[in-house]
Every structure is written in structure tokens, then in C-alpha cells.
Amino acid sequence: MTGLIQNRDAFLDNIAKELGRARKTEGVERPVWKSNVNIETLKDYSQEELLEVFKNQCTNIHTTVVETTNERLREDLQQVIMENGGGPILLSADERFDAYGLTSLFKEELPKRDVEVNVWDPERKDGNMRLAEKANIGIAFSDYTLAESGTIVVQSHKGQGRSLHFLPTVYLAIIPRETLVPRITQAVQDMNSRVEDGETAASCINFITGPSNSADIEMNLVVGVHGPLKAIYFIV
């Protein structure tokens, strides 16, 4: 359904009047950018160079980075989970857990160690929020990873909602290396291309830069007020 724009002409006429001129209704062209810093920044960096930028930025945002491989990911995840108090754990319902060989870790190995593991259920909205609220650890995959700011981008879908990323005490993000891009520009360009190709845009897109950081008027840093106390990134 196409939306309706109400009172547009009156609004634009008033702006033109305040500018002291007649309203322009034709011959208007989008101005050429004087600077392309949004595109030029880090554009010639290799994946390894972007990774170094990303890791350096993570030290500034109080985020631990674990470099791992497909073969070591299960072991590294289990170690970090146990070091951070175990469960309850809340996972996104994401096929990538199976693709990365993690299904048995969460279905068998961790439960044998008395670690409670739950998976986001698309049929239980309120139930999911309660699980997220009580979760010690939330785990999800990054859809885009921004080197410049140390940011992961996660898109809401039926298998994960916003609360999965913000309510658990500890947040673990699994980052496939191919998701690493220089900055927000490239991530948004790709999202836009997908929408133009017919994909439906996510109802909520979250840009997460480390754990929750807040500062009061005296610039005293407080961690965990609006989200997780700790964030750990696994680069695979």
C-alpha cells in the first residue's frame, strides 16, 4: 500500500516564503557531493588491514576480540561461556549455528554441564523476552561488521528480536570474516541493494558497538545501564 503525504504543498510553500523566494517545482537537481569521505575512508584496505582497524577500535570500546577458526570455534565458545558463568544462555534461531558445527555444543555438551540453553522461539514473543531478561549470556551472528567503529550490525527477524541483544548480562557475537566492511556506508549500500532486488527490509536493524556505555555529567563511565555489561566478539 502506498502512503499518503498530507499538507505537503502548504508546508513547502511556507518554507519558500520564509526563504524569501517563490517555490521551485521543476528543474531541481540533487547537488554533487563536495566530499566523498563516506566512500573514500578505508576503501583501499585489505580484509587483513580492516581486521586490524577493527581490533584496535575494540580496545577503545572495552570489547574483547577472540580470533578463531571454524575448527576451534566450538572450543573457544565453550571456554568463554564457562569463564563467564555459564547459563542461562539464549541463542538466536539461526541456521548458521548448524553451519558452523555448533548444534551439538548447545544441544548436548553444555546441557551435560548443567548449562541451561534456550533458543528464540518465533511463536513465543513474551516468553522470549522473559528468557532474554533472565539470560546470563546472549549469542548471535553479526550480519555486517564495521571496522571503523568496532560495530556489529544485527537485523531482527522471526528468529531473533531486539531483546536478545540488549537484555543478557554478557553478549557474544560470532563474526564471519566476510561480513567485515570499512564502515556504515558499505553496510547500508548493501542493504539498499537487497531491498531494490526485492528483499524485505528488517523491521529493526541494530548497530551495536561493544557493551553498554553511558557517562554522567562529570564524564564518569558507567557500563551496563542500557545493555550488556560485557561484549565479546568471535572473529571466524
Curated annotation (Swiss-Prot):
What SUPFAM superfamilies does the entry give?
NagB/RpiA/CoA transferase-like
Supply the InterPro entries for this chain.
FTHF_cligase-like_sf, LUD_dom, LutC, NagB/RpiA_transferase-like
Q: Name one GO biological process term.
A: lactate metabolic process
Under PANTHER family, the record lists: LACTATE UTILIZATION PROTEIN C (PTHR43682:SF1)
Similarity-based family: Belongs to the LutC/YkgG family.
What function does this protein fulfil? Is involved in L-lactate degradation and allows cells to grow with lactate as the sole carbon source.
The identity of this protein, by name, is: Lactate utilization protein C
* Gene name in the database record: lutC
